[in-house]
Amino acid sequence: MYYGFDMGGTKIELGVFDENLQRIWHKRVPTPCEDYPQLLQILRDLTEEADTYCGVQGSVGIGIPGLPNADDGTVFTANVPSAMGQPLQADLSRLIQREVRIDNDANCFALSEAWDPEFRTYPTVLGLILGTGVGGGLIVNGSIVSGRNHITGEFGHFRLPVDALDILGADIPRVPCGCGHRGCIENYISGRGFEWMYSHFYQHTLPATDIIAHYAAGEPKAVAHVERFMDVLAVCLGNLLTMLDPHLVVVGGGLSNFEKIYQELPKRLPAHLLRVARLPRIEKARYGDSGGVRGAAFLHLAEK
């Protein structure tokens, strides 16, 4: 049995998956904001409850919104203050008497998609999240590529490419990013960036859902905006594809529901790739909000 925890700032969700990778049980509880011992107790209680339900001890994986392991074995997760700077992996492993694995929630999303029965046939899978920010994960032969600092999937913090400046104008503001730099692509091609870009060019603020509705109705500003956005997205993704050369790209996050992405990217990407490059398959994520739990559960499976 495989147990996956998706640990966020407001809730902890546990999903239990059987040997056929089907979810058979799940539970949600509030996340304790400041109390680390309480957090450990909740995770222990949920694990033991799952053991009782399954009649066996399952493997345990946890996805967190942050960096899973610093050099000193602690986690960096500002959205879960009770775990910030704590040796969560070591402490919980000791409490439940089995190895616990922890990874970034975006990596868990990518792992979940890569272990889809159909997608599993692709050796290299790029999971790309276009949500409030931009992130994701790289999966090679069913396992996460983490890198030395566990930041391999922090795609949103690449700077705007030169070709994007040709589209947006050289005077486009280099928007300050939460990482401390300016001009990171997540400020332009995320859901938030989609809205910011519309506001910048038209001095009018609209939510993404309204912009997309206006686009569908043929409103000229919205049409021009979507065309511009798709061009910038193709430039940025083209750089990623040239560096990583995946067989499959799976798109998640709020903007993944904008079906125009899957129609337009295959048309626009070739201009930004090497001439010898073949386009990867580009698909919408299949597991939605359950992807984090599913991927966390498969952190052990990926090592088999």
Curated annotation (Swiss-Prot):
EC number from the UniProt entry: 2.7.1.59
Gene Ontology BP, a term: peptidoglycan turnover
Catalysed transformations (reactions): N-acetyl-D-glucosamine + ATP = N-acetyl-D-glucosamine 6-phosphate + ADP + H(+)
Binding residues for Zn(2+): 157, 177, 179, 184
UniProt KW keywords: ATP-binding, Carbohydrate metabolism, Kinase, Metal-binding, Nucleotide-binding, Transferase, Zinc
Domain of life: Bacteria
InterPro entries: ATPase_NBD, N-acetyl-D-glucosamine_kinase, ROK, ROK_cs
One term of GO molecular function: N-acetylglucosamine kinase activity
Main function: Catalyzes the phosphorylation of N-acetyl-D-glucosamine (GlcNAc) derived from cell-wall degradation, yielding GlcNAc-6-P.
Protein name: N-acetyl-D-glucosamine kinase
Species: Yersinia pseudotuberculosis serotype O:3 (strain YPIII)
Phylogenetic placement of the source organism: Bacteria, Pseudomonadati, Pseudomonadota, Gammaproteobacteria, Enterobacterales
The gene coding this protein: nagK
